[in-house]
């Protein structure tokens, strides 16, 4: 039978109703229920993976404050011409006011594959390692791009994060970086002739790319350092 409201009230000198759970038991029950839900959602085949993404994807987008921009991506005026096969430009999203510096290494006209290489300290970090990464990809016919993700390289900006609840009302640096990766991937996917887009995350940028790929549709491949 249902408890009477008066019997559920607890005042000084009055105990809990018989069988009432303690605060700790309530918390344990909620945790156990969520763990069971996650276990049931754990992917075991392609259909399970699709269901997992459908259920948990909105939560990830909400937690990061990031989304796939699609046709909302805008390309700003090139900050340089095509010099030695390299072009500098900036990307943004319509109505958002963001700016993502991007460097593009040209590929042969017949190229159908593109890769975004994301370093933790900005584009210059990739340039310093061209002999080991960018040039081999170019020789194999890849269109290669890299970005200065939020608060790295030329996109550095001072942020006062001393407020105790800063992340309640503002995106963290890493959340903004995930969005920048998504913006660049979306732009690459819309390049004429490009049929496959892959993603590489170096060092500390690996986790940014792992989070971004969960919100990016149909990437050909993802290689990301995940031990940071």
Could you tell me what each predicted segment is?
Residues 200-210:
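Gly/Ala-rich beta-loop-alpha elbow adjacent to hydrolase catalytic centers
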Residues 211-215:
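Active-site signature of alpha/beta-hydrolase-fold catalytic machinery across serine-
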Residues 1-113, 122-143, 150-153, 158-190, ...:
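Alpha/beta-hydrolase-fold serine-hydrolase catalytic core, especially in secreted/extracellular enzymes
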Residues 117-119:
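Charged, long alpha-helical assembly modules
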Residues 148, 200, 225-226:
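Alpha/beta-hydrolase-fold catalytic nucleophile elbow
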């Amino acid at each position: 039978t249902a408890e009477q409201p008066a019997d559920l009230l607890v005042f000084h000198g009055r105990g809990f109703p018989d069988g009432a759970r303690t605060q700790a038991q309530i918390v344990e029950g909620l945790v156990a229920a969520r763990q069971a839900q996650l276990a049931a959602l754990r992917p075991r085949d392609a259909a399970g993976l699709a269901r997992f993404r459908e259920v948990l994807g909105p939560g990830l987008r909400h937690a990061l404050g990031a989304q796939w921009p699609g046709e909302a991506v805008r390309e700003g005026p090139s900050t340089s011409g095509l010099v030695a096969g390299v072009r500098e430009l900036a990307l943004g999203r319509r109505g958002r006011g963001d700016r993502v510096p991007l460097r593009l290494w040209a590929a042969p006209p017949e190229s159908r594959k593109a890769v975004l290489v994301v370093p933790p300290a900005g584009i210059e970090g990739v340039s310093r390692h061209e002999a080991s990464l960018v040039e081999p990809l170019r020789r194999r016919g890849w269109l290669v791009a890299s970005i200065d993700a939020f608060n790295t390289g030329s996109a550095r900006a001072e942020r006062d994060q001393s407020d105790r609840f800063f992340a309640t009302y503002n995106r963290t640096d890493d959340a903004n970086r995930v969005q920048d990766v998504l913006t660049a991937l979306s732009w690459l996917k819309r390049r004429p002739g490009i049929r496959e887009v892959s993603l590489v995350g170096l060092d500390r940028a690996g986790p940014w790319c792992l989070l971004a790929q969960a919100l990016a549709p149909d990437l050909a491949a993802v290689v990301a350092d995940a031990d940071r």
